[in-house]
């Protein structure tokens, strides 16, 4: 209920603000219609539209005329924008017209000055006419015959018939025609002179172009010769560098060859010398051993022969031959034949073994000698091959050196010839360049003289052409400005017609505004009726509060009498609800207060810490539990008599009532907190809106006391 009333209040306040802003807009429009002013109305209307858009109805009941008001305001805004555009266009056209008028006045002044200049020039022409006619009569006649025969015919006809015009007007026209003819003659003469000079200049320019082309070709040739000289110098430097490199390489190769020869000789001396000496020593040692072995063998053979002879001569004189023939058969004979035979055989065996070893050593020495000889031969062949290769390399290097020397000499000769040719070409080029420079200087002098004469003639032509061009330009500018004036007048007529249409539209919009204001007045009347109803409801609430206070005082008095009486049915119901609701804190708090527990009992139960806050019994208008218990204990018989017929008893109903009342009170407190927050937010928005629209604020509809009353 309270939220709907607040929404109605906010909507009515917005409607009132819109109505006041519409009144301000109408005043501004009337001012605009009276004095053709746009800035004030635009500013007011823009603020009005901002306020409307700011106060968009979102919370409660929308007024039926709100959309129509917005639509009308949008149309009014469009009309005002079109009016502002029309006014800006009119201002721009007025500025353009002023500029055009200023330009026309300037052109008139320039025309007057040109007329004065023409009069002065005509006087000067009259004075110089006699001189010009004497000096250049024949040339002017020729030019007129070639270029403008019609003009000559006209001038002659005018000169031959002076007597036809007898009045003053005829004389004036004759003088004007003569001046025109003279001006035409001067123009023809200047044009013919300019054409002749132009042809001469063209010829001279062609000659200059030819000379310049020849100069450019000679410069290109000289540059090409210079490039060739530079290339020849570079080639010479390259060849000299190559020759120096080849000489350095030859010196390095000769040094390497010398080092190789030295190394070869040293290696031969180092490798062959000790090998040969070692072989010689080994050979000598082997020869000595061989001689010693031969001597021992000969001695042993002699001793053997002597011993054989002795044995054969004593025991077996016929066996000497068999021993000499078959010495190996001695082993087969019995050892008992000769007592020193075994020792002799052993010594012979030893000697044979020594001989075999010496033979083996001799063979080994011979093999080593053969191997060393072969090795020496191989080394000699390798060294000879190396020497042959070195000699070949030396010969090849000598041949290359000779070939390079011949090339160097040939290149030096060609360089000398090229240098001499270059010097000759340079001298010839220098002579040609000098001649060309002289010719160029002469041509430049001629060019400067011709250009000076051309410039002087061009200045004269330009002066005459500028005078004529200014005259024709002024005439064309006048015609152009007249056309623009006509166009501007047509556009002004169109803009005035548009302004009339916009005024008619404004009148229709004003009528629609009046209809909207009548609807707003009706809405204000409805709001006043709602205010009266709200005041009546507030009075009824005040009466109900007074009755409640009286009943509360009575209940307090009754509770003092029945303070220690509680109905057992209430106690039973409290216990049952406590266990049913899983030891609810609120039910326990209610039991503690209704039964009047002491501090020790509370500590035993554990309700001392849980006390405080929003209890169930406080939900019933804020009275203690003992008071409620006293009431029920004092009137237990009456309650028992008036109990319902169904299963629920009065105690059950009473406890349910207390719990429901507590829940309702908590919910009410939450709603009140939310309403207070919303109220604070709305008040902030209103304050911001009031600060923002302080320029266009109106007198408030109701006082602050009524607003406070409605918020309560």
Curated annotation (Swiss-Prot):
Which parts of the sequence are annotated with region: Disordered? 23-49, 135-176, 306-347, 666-712
Which regions span the lipid bilayer? none
Q: Which UniProt keywords apply?
A: Coiled coil, Endosome, Golgi apparatus
**Location relative to the cell:** Golgi apparatus; Endosome
Its domain of life? Answer: Eukaryota
Q: Where is the composition biased (Basic and acidic residues)?
A: 328-344, 678-695
Q: Which residues form the GRIP domain?
A: 557-608
Q: Does the keyword Coiled coil apply?
A: yes
Provide one Gene Ontology biological process annotation: Golgi organization
GO CC term, one of those recorded: endosome
Locate the coiled-coil region(s) and give their ranges. 65-134, 197-313, 340-558, 659-690
Biased region (Polar residues) positions are 36-49, 135-150, 696-712
Domain comment from the record reads as follows:
The C-terminal domain (551-712) is responsible for the Golgi localization.
Function field: Golgi matrix protein playing a role in tethering of vesicles to Golgi membranes and in maintaining the overall structure of the Golgi apparatus.
Q: How does it assemble?
A: Interacts with ARF1; preferentially with the active form of the protein.
Q: What is this protein called?
A: Golgin candidate 3
Its source organism is: Arabidopsis thaliana
Its ancestry begins with: Eukaryota, Viridiplantae, Streptophyta, Embryophyta, Tracheophyta
